[in-house]
Swiss-Prot record:
It comes from Sonchus yellow net virus. It is found in: Host cell junction, Host plasmodesma. Keywords: Host cell junction, Host-virus interaction, RNA-binding, Transport, Viral movement protein. GO terms for molecular function: RNA binding. Residues 1-20 are annotated as: Disordered. Transports viral genome to neighboring plant cells directly through plasmosdesmata, without any budding. The movement protein allows efficient cell to cell propagation, by bypassing the host cell wall barrier. Interacts with nucleoprotein. This is Movement protein. It comes from the Viruses. GO terms for cellular component: host cell plasmodesma. One of its GO terms (biological process) is transport of virus in host, cell to cell.
Amino acid sequence: MEGLSSKAQTMGREDDNRSSKMKVFHSELVYGDNHNISIKKADLTGQHKMMLLLSSALRIGSVHMDVSRILVKWCPYITPNMNTTIGITIKNNHHDDMSNINDMSTYISVKGKMSEALQITWHPASTLVYKKGMSCIFPWVVDVDTGSTEQESGSPALGEIKIWCYFKMQYHKPSTRHIARAEIAPSIEWGNTNFPYYVPFAMIRRARGIRPLDVFSTNQYSMFLEDVIKHVGTDSIKESDIVPIMSTMSQEDMMMINEKNKTCLLKRGGSYCSCKDVIENVVKEINMNRDRKYDNHGLLLSGYIAGSTSGRFQTVPMLSDISY
C-alpha cells in the first residue's frame, strides 16, 4: 500500500475528522483456464496495514470512505499474431450467486485484443459509509474474461491484470456536511503497438442511459481517415468494412500505405488524390488477407450505437458476440 499519509496515525482519536489518502494495489496473472476472474473486496483491502487501520477505526466510530477512482490495467504477455480476446467488466458486488451479471448493476463492459494493453479508469460517484462495529465490504467487482482461450497445464501466463484503488478515509459524523459528487466520465485507453488503427469495443452506463465507445471520434479513426479513406473514398470501402479493416491493419501495413501516399497531391495541398489506384490495391489486398472473425464488427458496432440511441438497452450488454 502506498500513499498512506501521516494523518492516518490520528484516526484513533474520535474528535479528529481529518482524512487519510490511500492507494491500494492488487495484481493477478491470467491464464487461459481462468475464464472468469473476480477481484473482490478481499483483494483490494487485504493488505495487513490497511486492514488493521480499518478495523481499529470501525471499533471507534463510523467510517466515511471516498473512492476517487479505480484503475484497471491489462498487461499482455503474448505475441500479436495470437488472435484472442480480453474482456473486462466493472459491476456491483452482489452477495448471492444467483445474480445475473447482465443487469442494472453493470457499469462498464469492454472487449479488446488480448495482445494489446487495455486500461479503464472509473470514478465511482457514490460514497461508502460504514457503521461502527460493521465489517468492511467493498461494493464493486472487476471481472476478467479470456473467452475461449485454452492453455495446457504449465503454460506461461497470457498476461497480468493490475488494479489500483485510490480513496480517502475519515470518521463519519452526522454533523459533517458531505457534498454530493458529480459524475465523472470513465476513460478507456488502449495500446496500438502492433495495430495502429485498432479500437476496442466498450459499453458504459452513464447518469443517463448506456453509451458505446464512439470509434468514429477516436484518434485512431482520424488517422485512418487521413491515411486511407481520403485517398480511396467511401466508394472503395464499405462502411461495414471500416472497423474490421482498422482492427486488422498492422504497423507494417500503415508504413507501406504512408510510403505510397507520401507524394500524393493531397498531402501537398492539392485538390485531388494522385495515388488512389495504388492505395486501393493495397487496401483490397489487406481486406482479402485478414482474419474473417472481424467481418461482423462493423455491423455489430452499428447495432450497439442504434440500441443506445433508441433506448433499447436498459442493461449494459456484455459484448458476448465480439471476438478477436
